[in-house]
Amino acid sequence: MESALIEIIRKGVTDRAGVPSPDPFPRVLRVAIEPIEHLTYRARPAEEPQFELYIDEPRERGGNDKGPSPITYFLTGIATCLLNQFLRLAITTEMPISVSSMLAKAIFERTVGGGFKEIVNELYLEGNITLEELQGLATMAESYCYIHNTMSKSVLMTTELYLNGEHVATRSSGPKV
């Protein structure tokens, strides 16, 4: 990885660790959403205007099939936020690991008034670290992840850790833990 990017990541982690709690200057994230047709929408993040996201539903649910569904973006955001924190912290601490893949699963009720029961993130890592080091990294990554912190207040969040192809730990947080 380019050394300038590594330094940006390290500075971000260090700066974030120094923010007092509660944050005296919380950020506001804005996304402008434009209806296109039926259930198709275009979203533009205010702080990243160079990107456009298309959100839709499959045809069998009345959409035009021009983009992932809202729930897919939701789950993707949950998983990648946590993944970013694992990688940022591993880079910052020079932990000798790499991520080979991640699988996110959401268990939810499709009833009116239903909601998520559990969100499971399976993280597959390769490297020469101890289980204790991996657990420490996971604790830090979860604490740095805004989405994980928010979701664990209302739903069971499970992180399954795999190291060098072997399941080594299950971590859970949430209202039922």
Residues covered by each model-derived region:
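Compact, glycine-rich, soluble single-domain proteins
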Residues: 75-83
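Extended beta-strand/beta-hairpin segments
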Residues: 1-73, 88-177
